[in-house]
Amino acid sequence: MSELLSFALFLASVLIYAWKAGRNTWWFAATLTVLGLFVVLNITLFASDYFTGDGINDAVLYTLTNSLTGAGVSKYILPGIGIVLGLAAVFGALGWILRRRRHHPHHFGYSLLALLLALGSVDASPAFRQITELVKSQSRDGDPDFAAYYKEPSKTIPDPKLNLVYIYGESLERTYFDNEAFPDLTPELGALKNEGLDFSHTQQLPGTDYTIAGMVASQCGIPLFAPFEGNASASVSSFFPQNICLGDILKNSGYQNYFVQGANLRFAGKDVFLKSHGFDHLYGSEELKSVVADPHYRNDWGFYDDTVLDEAWKKFEELSRSGQRFSLFTLTVDTHHPDGFISRTCNRKKYDFDGKPNQSFSAVSCSQENIATFINKIKASPWFKDTVIVVSSDHLAMNNTAWKYLNKQDRNNLFFVIRGDKPQQETLAVKRNTMDNGATVLDILGGDNYLGLGRSSLSGQSMSEIFLNIKEKTLAWKPDIIRLWKFPKEMKEFTIDQQKNMIAFSGSHFRLPLLLRVSDKRVEPLPESEYSAPLRFQLADFAPRDNFVWVDRCYKMAQLWAPELALSTDWCVSQGQLGGQQIVQHVDKAIWKGKTAFKDTVIDMARYKGNVDTLKIVDNDIRYKADSFIFNVAGAPEEVKQFSGISRPESWGRWSNAQLGDEVKIEYKHPLPKKFDLVITAKAYGNNASRPIPVRVGNEEQTLVLGNEVTTTTLHFDNPTDADTLVIVPPEPVSTNEGNILGHSPRKLGIGMVEIKVVEREG
């Protein structure tokens, strides 16, 4: 209803101003600004819904000041461009409409009415309400009743008798199991769901709406609210260190806790969370690649579900035979948005909806088959009678190709339990949420029936039943939950451990690189993650007087304040204010100790603007002074005009990437020497090794042969035509995820370049 009211007020404002208000520059500017704000808010809501499926939430608030990089970003570029072009077109049209009667005399009453209606349209818009609520949640002090509802359970289960298998289905919400809405989509896993305890109304709350947040909610009974963006959790050294979570209780009760997934464990700090809470045995893409049957059978995130669940079955067999009490948690990935992935072993590879194939539905149908196969193996084993199997979604599906169809249904998370010791077949429609999952499992295993804010759905009352406004209540508790991190409020001294790549201050430890905003009573960490902007772009959003400490590779800050370190890949520390003084210190000891030293200086806005502009220079446009092209730092030598076909810098150098260009091209500002030696330090990838690689300058071509290890080769060139471009053509680029950023599309690698140097020859 508020959407209709908001739009009606907007339309009325436009019509009244355009036809009645007349000519007045000030009123025109004010009305256009407010109406433009309405448009921006609603486009933001539309775009946020596209990415999150949940409107403007915490993740969006963070992303408003940080770029979205990482998983599947290339698939969102076209919609993003469309939104920008649409916004420009709407603003242009709006300005044209408002000035239709600009030659008529100004009318104060109609101008005021139009402006008030415009303000009303903004106030009534759902986007404004969502943003207002989020901003309030950032500034609240908490809710006094948090302590009454947050309950820590006993640290042990008195007499544990059952092993636990807990399966997180990536985005595998219960809505997919509606056979009337989606016929025959999930027959195998749906049949198993109907044989167990099926909890049909598990809602999603703020702070539980992405994978690591869903895991924290289900195991600790609290939303993932942190003093930093949740997916950047990989940078912390401990995760809710004071909380008692399900893994802690299991370990204290004699369980060996295992976790198996196909993606990298470091993404979003899953490894940190699990190690902090009782898990000693973790297997992700790095740990599995030496044991799986086919290490090259991978999708953008890691190993396919059939591979992961095969390894989980092997681990279940091994642990069951040992007689040791255990829990085995696993997380699938094939149903990840925006499209999902199809494992090669499933029979259900294609699902049509609305008369055409749908990739997301197909991925769901395939993945549920793989999960069902895994469960049926356990059920057929002699160890099933001693096992509890839990299947849950980590969160509701985000915007995938099935999302618009899901939104037509009553959406809930998946949570069902199959008990080998005591088969129970029942659908329980009690109102609950993800935080109740851990407490319910704990209750079944013989422990307490509460865990944090979670309550057992078998013997307790969920917060979703107690509070009709549970979403608002959860946001009200946000400051209380953030305080559970015990995060420091000041930073005076700090220590950098180069071997561990960690920084420590005031009792907290973070992985490097790291940016910190330091104020009188707050230290805000801004880690670098797959979903966040590089730290220099985050620093560019700081206010002129904000105190910062930035620990990163020296070359990243050298272009601003320490040009002598432009080629150094060591750690450096920069601190100061963007509009004031900055210092850069080279970390030259294994254990390096520093102090914060912020001076209360006069702010220079010209200096501030210059710093911000420099920080925002994209990597390929950075230039440094050097007599060769050094590939393990960003940018290129000053002599280089532009380059293409080259991937991002890594610790050793850079790969060619045929996704960015079939050839490596380096164009220099001036013609290359008439005679010169080209000294290339490089290696080849895969089938490019031991094969002739053409290297061209103008009309002359030489051949380069590389192995899988780095070598240095000198080629002799004559350049009578004054050519200014060097071209290298890898013969057979290989599509691979090796060394790739998690969630990105595969790169096509050819050669790995460490250094290229042009040496002029006499004569």
UniProtKB/Swiss-Prot annotation:
One of its GO terms (cellular component) is plasma membrane. InterPro entries: Alkaline_phosphatase_core_sf, DUF7024, OpgB, OpgB/LTA_synthase_biosynth, Sulfatase_N. The keyword Ligase does not apply. One of its GO terms (biological process) is glucan biosynthetic process. It is a multi-pass membrane protein. Its main location: membrane. The chain crosses the membrane at residues 4-19, 26-48, 76-98, 105-127. Keywords: Cell inner membrane, Cell membrane, Membrane, Transferase, Transmembrane, Transmembrane helix. It is found in: Cell inner membrane. One of its GO terms (molecular function) is phosphatidylglycerol-membrane-oligosaccharide glycerophosphotransferase activity. It comes from the Bacteria. The keyword 4Fe-4S does not apply. Transfers a phosphoglycerol residue from phosphatidylglycerol to the membrane-bound nascent glucan backbones. HAMAP family: MdoB_OpgB. This is Phosphoglycerol transferase I. It comes from Escherichia coli O6:H1 (strain CFT073 / ATCC 700928 / UPEC). The gene is mdoB.
